């Protein structure tokens, strides 16, 4: 038996494997609310311009509301035989209200319908992710304010480089997530055009009002080219690109949490809420939440790569390949949402060991740059010469297994005779961070000010997410 939604020219139904590979209801059921919203706007417009009667439009709208209630309550039965969410909804509508349901699809194709539904879903998801990113920024800024003066090592090449503060380190991620929010908002602004009314690819001969449906659905305007309207998936690619970058930021932070929680670092501790044990080693406390955030970044990046490969060879306009646009996007953006929730919880939960971090900050000659700067400022040495002198002093200290601050003044003067006792003021890690007063630097006063600025800005954001 052929599919009654499209099977008029077919003498028989599809093969079982064709049904299996063709059906998308197993994942596009997630578009149900967007599909119903689009259909309600469409039928209201059809009635306004006189294409369907007011009575039919009212019956269709009432039926769509009933279907929405069934889906929300869990009473709706999704049918694989009906392929996708669009045909599942339309079939149920016909069962509820009869022949009038057949008028809903006037001047519309599944091509513009799915493009609309997916845009609405991505837009809703961006709004939700933006709210989660804001929550993570707040948690980071609050913790940064609390630990604005807690000294820790700053690293380059995973080697101790210069002392920074824990608060400063956390604020670096606040900045990263701000850029992620900006990218998602940019993607949202570009996707906010309605493809509804483009029909299959060429538009329609019916006197529809695309501007009316665009307004009703919260879009800025209708799309301007019907071919592009049904074949465009840039809005998904751009959103996945922004999501992948955000996932990379989360993964980098997760990696640091994993390192910090090792006995070898011992910089921070996650509570039992975000740790697990071993089935064989009773002493273990594994930072599994952070490891899973790190791992899920690969899924988000993979979804972006996968969709790029799907789209790269498609001529205009719609091809069935484009059904593969959704499953990866659903998974990737859900994974990102989980990661944001987990990371926000870990940030609130994490307990830094400030004494251990401070001790580590003083190891590895992390104040060598401060010494070089002092030689420039106090003695007038060119920086390259100061760099060379400092290197010789580090070598002298290292040969004796001492810190720079443990060298005697006479030992320093053996390298550079003009060094005086004032040098010792810059060799402590707390003095080092206090001196970094340049804009964006790690001085605790700077960090406190930046944390307050972020907390104020985030608190002042309007209640609506975008």
UniProtKB/Swiss-Prot annotation:
It catalyses: 2-(N(omega)-L-arginino)succinate = fumarate + L-arginine. The keyword NADP does not apply. It holds the Pfam family ASL_C2. InterPro entries: Arg_succ_lyase_C (IPR029419), Argininosuccinate_lyase (IPR009049), Fumarase/histidase_N (IPR024083), Fumarate_lyase_CS (IPR020557), Fumarate_lyase_fam (IPR000362), Fumarate_lyase_N (IPR022761), L-Aspartase-like (IPR008948). Belongs to the lyase 1 family. Argininosuccinate lyase subfamily. HAMAP family: Arg_succ_lyase. This is Argininosuccinate lyase.
């Amino acid at each position: 038996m052929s599919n009654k939604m499209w099977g008029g020219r077919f003498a028989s139904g599809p093969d079982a494997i064709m049904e299996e590979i063709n059906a998308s209801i197993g994942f596009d059921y997630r578009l149900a609310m967007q599909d119903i919203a689009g259909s309600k706007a469409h039928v209201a417009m059809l009635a306004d311009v006189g294409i369907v009667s007011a009575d039919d439009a009212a019956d269709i709208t009432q039926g769509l509301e009933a279907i929405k209630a069934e889906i929300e309550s869990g009473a709706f039965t999704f049918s694989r035989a009906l392929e996708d969410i669009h045909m599942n909804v339309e079939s149920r509508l016909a069962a509820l209200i009869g022949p009038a349901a057949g008028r809903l699809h006037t001047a519309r194709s599944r091509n513009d319908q799915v493009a609309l539904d997916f845009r609405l879903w991505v837009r809703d998801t961006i709004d939700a992710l933006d709210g989660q990113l804001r929550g993570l920024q707040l948690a980071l800024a609050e913790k940064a304010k609390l630990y604005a003066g807690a000294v820790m090592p700053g690293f380059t090449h995973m080697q101790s480089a210069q002392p920074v503060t824990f608060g400063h380190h956390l604020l670096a991620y606040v900045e990263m997530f701000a850029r992620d929010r900006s990218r998602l908002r940019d993607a949202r602004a570009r996707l906010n055009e309605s493809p509804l009314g483009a029909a299959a690819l060429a538009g329609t001969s019916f006197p529809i009002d695309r501007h009316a449906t665009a307004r009703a659905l919260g879009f800025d305007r209708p799309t301007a080219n019907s071919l592009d309207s049904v074949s465009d998936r840039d809005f998904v690619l751009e959103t996945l690109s922004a999501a992948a970058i955000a996932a990379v930021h989360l993964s980098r932070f997760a990696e640091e949490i994993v390192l910090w929680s090792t006995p070898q670092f011992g910089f921070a501790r996650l509570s039992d809420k975000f740790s697990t044990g071993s089935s064989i080693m009773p002493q273990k406390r594994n930072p599994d939440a952070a490891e899973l955030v790190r791992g899920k970044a690969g899924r988000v990046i993979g979804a972006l790569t996968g969709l790029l490969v799907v789209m790269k060879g498609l001529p205009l306009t719609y091809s069935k390949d484009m059904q593969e646009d959704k499953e990866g996007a659903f998974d990737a953006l859900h994974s990102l949402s989980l990661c944001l929730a987990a990371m926000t919880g870990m940030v609130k939960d994490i307990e830094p060991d400030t004494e251990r971090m401070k001790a580590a900050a003083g190891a590895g000659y992390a104040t060598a740059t401060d010494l070089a700067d002092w030689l420039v400022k106090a003695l007038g040495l060119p920086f390259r010469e100061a760099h060379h002198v400092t290197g010789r002093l580090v070598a002298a200290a290292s040969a004796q297994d001492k810190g720079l601050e443990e060298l005697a003044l006479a030992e320093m003067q053996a390298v550079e005779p003009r060094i005086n006792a004032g040098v010792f003021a810059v060799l402590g890690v707390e003095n080092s961070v206090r001196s970094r007063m340049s804009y964006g630097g790690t001085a605790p006063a700077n960090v406190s000010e930046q944390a307050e600025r972020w907390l104020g800005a985030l608190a002042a954001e309007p209640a609506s997410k975008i």
